[in-house]
Structures are given as structure tokens and as C-alpha cells.
């Protein structure tokens, strides 16, 4: 591949499509970040950031948060709706509301609110989230209260009204209304109520049941009418100010958004006709992120832009208002994934590898060797004269026969190992002879790429840092941070540190699609090999679990400055003491046990006892990941 170039590297890893312009490959073959997408500003080298974080005591793995990407995501979303409203002559306003469940890290929420400067509100879906939101929302700011509610939740939301916040208390279950009426009367507070309706429209995708008729939340048409009637009977219909619905999360197809908005717009018109003074429509989530860069209807992609999304939301409401002579409502979106996914990158390193050997140094079987070895050797030596598919099938048959003979005690371990070596050599040779442009070759090419892929063992826990990969086969872009000026001469499957076969990434961005192996410059034992796992800023931190007691990773924030960038907010990940405490192991009790056992250990002198105890103490203080 002597014609390899940085342009080809961008194509192979599809960087320009999934990165949103925030990440690129430099002429030196290194991954760089452009947090504000300003081409005039020098890009930030990710490997350099990892080195600086290590200098500050944060080894790998480390989660890097680019705060300026959060700013740019907020600006892009608000600008898209502003432009869509100008184009349609829309007379309502727009506010982005951030659902903190997507990423509750305080610095993330604070950055979004601070940079939003009145353009962004917050959404809470539980009492703990509400307590955080009531503290972080600036005076006069917007708060949307979703989720299941008890009396205390309702009371806290009404207290938010007393604190001067624009709190919208959304009725998601009909039973919640009576609690609201009682608590509002008890506190003497006039609430701003929202009503979440359950649309028939479903946005296809991995989370499609978060919207539509099967949704966990929301009122049916009959329940919505009953809520209106109850409010009217109580003389409180003027409390109903907001219509809320949710099409789904990560909707890949713009047509689903268009259809859902038409249905939702009718709800707005009907509620106004019933006398409810609804003045805000909260369209919920759904705005996607193109994780795989294919710009398609694939569940991990999206076939539209933020601007197209904004246009379809605005135009649907504009159309029904013009047709019915209604005031244009203010619009709220809850696009938390689109706000936060891009800003976080997990940087880790390869700690070991397992490579399938090729045909170098392969020796012919001895004359007395079992027949199956000679048959496999005949396939190997005759590859140039045979059709690749025929040779593969014969070699596969020979390997299966050798494995069966071994199981019956006919072949010994050495014979089996030789059979596997010849098989591997055949597969490597066939891989070079297959042409991906020929349809009959493609299936075998994919199979061989998977069989011959290197296994690279990486210093992270998939269950802690990328739980959606295990849970829903989510795709996250992965690529080396260096050496991308070299051709990807190998393919690999990435394994994590856990003692679990599911701790493996099985889908990788590759050009305009997803493959089961990742193209890489060859890993060389003993050399640092850094990998970046991108777009992990939404949901992954809070959903991560402690399988094998691997805890939170180190994290650090990156902020642009006039001179380049600065690291801030360095947070050390969990120590072994931390994770043991989560499962009810007291470090002091453990220390006491260690001391007793060191004293009782035979054959240790005083110096050895002291060193043994020091090592055990250091182990409790250590990072849960490997020291590299």
C-alpha cells in the first residue's frame, strides 16, 4: 500500500463523517481535536493530552472531556432552530433543555448552563436529579419535571416555583394530577403544568419503545381528555401551559420525525380548541448522533442534519398554526445525546496482543506423520493452482478432521498444533488472493478477516466505560491516536480487562459501514499503542458498572485558551479501596487481617514482613486498572 495517504486514513476510519468536525487526522498521522471547529486555531494532539494528563498523575485509561465541544453543540442546536424559525417566519421562541440523566457530571451540566446563558434549561426525571437541577438552574431559568412522581417530588417542584424558577411539572400518569392539585393548594402555589401524550408514531431504532403507544410514560388520548376535564372542573385549566411528547431516542430516519411532528401538532391544536392555554410544546428527545458515520437509517446513524431536524420540528408546528389560526407556541427540545456525545473521549492503551501466525518457517510434515497433515500440506503447497473458495473448503475440512481425530486420541497435541498452523497459513495466503470487488469472494473475505484478526488486550473495562456496547450493540468509533500515516496492515478485535467473554468490542466503524474487525497499523510488542474511543459523552459514565470491580477511570477537562489549551478538573478514578467499599469490604478490616497473616507467616524476617505489608497497603491505594 505504497499509495497510502492521510486522505485514505480519513476514509478508512470515516473520521470526517462521525466526528462532526471535532476530530481529524494530522499530516503526521496523529489524531487531533478541534473543539470549536475553528480551522484557524491549531488543533490539539490527543496523544499529547494523554501525556500531559499522565504528568499530572492521571495514567491510562483516562476520560478526556472537551468543554468547548459542549459549547459548540449548544450553539449549533440553538442556531439551527433560530434559522429554521427565521425561514418560516415562526413567531414562537426556542429553548434547549438538557436532560441531566444523559450525563449528570456536575461540570458537564454547569458548562452547558453557563454557556447557554439563558438559552438552555434543565430536565429532571427523579428526585435526586430534581435536587441538583433546583440548585444549578439560574434564577428565572427553565426546569422540566418528568418521570414518576410522589407527593414529595411534586412538593419540591412547586418549591422551585417559589424560588423563582420556571418549573413545568409534567403530568405523565393520570394519577399524578390529584397530587398536584392537593400540594398546590397546600402551598398556595400556582403551577405551570405540562401534559405528556403518547403518540401512535414510533421512531424506529434501538430505543423505539421510549415513544409510541408502548411507551412507559404518557397519556392516551382518552386520559388526556380526562385530565383536561378534571382541570376544568377544578377551575384550573389555565394551569395547563405545556404539551410534551417523546418520539424516541436516537431516531435515525428523518421521516419518522416528520410523521411524529404532524401527529403532535394536531394535539397542540386540539388542546387549544378545548380551551387549554398551551403556550409551549416540548418535543422531547430523538435528535440522533451519527456514531458510525454512515449517514444512513442504521440504528447507530442518522440520515439528516441538525438543521433538517430543526426545520421539520418548526415547520410542522408552523403549518398547523397557520391552518388553524393559532398562536405559534414556544418550542423546547430535550436533545441531551446530541449535546454531549461528542465531547468525551476515552484514551487507553494496548497491553498485550495475540496474533494468528502466517506461513513463515512452516515445515513439511514428516513421512510418518498422520495422513490428515499431508492432506493439509497439499492444500497449502497447491494454493496457486486452485480456486480460493475450493482451497478454503478443503483446508477447513482437513482442520475439522484433525480436531476430531485429536478428540478420539488418534492425533497427539503436537499433531493438532501442526494442523492448526497449516490451516492458519492457508487462511493468511487466501486472504491476499481474494478480491472484495468480486461478490463470491466477499463472504469469505469477511470470515477470514474475523478469523485472522489480532486480539488486542486493552487497559479498560467495556462494562464501565462503554456499557451500551454490551447492552445494545452500540457502535463507538475507535482508532489509534498515532501512526495513522502508516497503512492499516492488520485487523484486530479489541478485548477489555474483564474476565468475561462479553468484554469485547464486536463492531467497528470501517469506511461507510460497520465491520467485525478494526483496521490498524500493526501493534508492536513493547511499543506504546494508544487508542481513542470516541463519542462516549452520553449515558456511558452513569450507566457504567463495576464488573470485576473495575471502577471509574481518571478524568480531566480540556479547555481552549489563547495560548492553546489547559487541563483542569483532574479527577482520580476509583482506588481499590473505593470499589471494595461499594461491596461492603472495609479497608481497615482488611488491613487488620493482612497484619495478622503477615505476622503469622512462616519464613519471613522482619524486613520481609514490613515489605509484604507495605505491598498490601499500596495495593489498597492503587488504581483498579493496570499500571502501564
Swiss-Prot record:
Pathway assigned to this chain's UniProt record: Amine and polyamine biosynthesis; agmatine biosynthesis; agmatine from L-arginine: step 1/1
UniProt xrefs under Gene3D superfamilies: 1.10.287.3440, 1.20.58.930, Alanine racemase, Lyase, Ornithine Decarboxylase, Chain A, domain 1
Enzyme nomenclature, EC number: 4.1.1.19
Alphabetical GO biological process terms: arginine catabolic process; putrescine biosynthetic process from arginine; spermidine biosynthetic process
Highest taxon in the source lineage: Bacteria
Catalytic activity: L-arginine + H(+) = agmatine + CO2
InterPro entries: Ala_racemase/Decarboxylase_C, Arg_decarb_HB, Arg_decarbox_C, Arg_decrbxlase, De-COase2_CS, De-COase2_N, De-COase2_pyr-phos_BS, Orn/DAP/Arg_de-COase
List of residues binding substrate: 281-291
UniProt keyword terms in alphabetical order: Decarboxylase, Lyase, Magnesium, Metal-binding, Polyamine biosynthesis, Pyridoxal phosphate, Spermidine biosynthesis
Leading EC class: lyase
GO molecular function: arginine decarboxylase activity; metal ion binding
Alphabetized PROSITE patterns for the sequence: ODR_DC_2_1, ODR_DC_2_2
Cofactor(s) demanded: Mg(2+); pyridoxal 5'-phosphate
Modified residues (N6-(pyridoxal phosphate)lysine): 101
Matching NCBIfam families: PRK05354.1 (NF003763), speA (TIGR01273)
Function: Catalyzes the biosynthesis of agmatine from arginine.
Similarity field: Belongs to the Orn/Lys/Arg decarboxylase class-II family. SpeA subfamily.
Cited PANTHER family: ARGININE DECARBOXYLASE, BIOSYNTHETIC ARGININE DECARBOXYLASE
Protein name per UniProt: Biosynthetic arginine decarboxylase
Organism listed in the record: Alkalilimnicola ehrlichii (strain ATCC BAA-1101 / DSM 17681 / MLHE-1)
